């Protein structure tokens, strides 16, 4: 599978971040519902990209950043 990294970084990541912000406002950033959504959606997107290492590492960075924000 050839991956369009430009599309991934310019569309997929920003769209996911926007949905993440919306979800955190809906259910609360610290809620189990939010974190389940985070893990589920990250997993789904990574699978769409056949768990490509750059994709999974990027989402790993985002997940770690979110955890730090949560305190």
Residue spans for each PLM region:
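Amphipathic, non-membrane alpha-helical rod segments
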Residues: 30-49
């Amino acid at each position: 599978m050839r991956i369009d990294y430009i599309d991934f970084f310019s569309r997929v990541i920003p769209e996911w971040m926007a949905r993440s912000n919306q979800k955190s406002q809906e259910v609360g950033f610290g809620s189990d519902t939010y974190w389940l959504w985070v893990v589920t959606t990250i997993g789904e997107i990574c699978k769409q990209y056949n768990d490509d290492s750059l994709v999974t590492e990027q989402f790993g960075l985002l997940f770690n950043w979110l955890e730090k924000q949560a305190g």
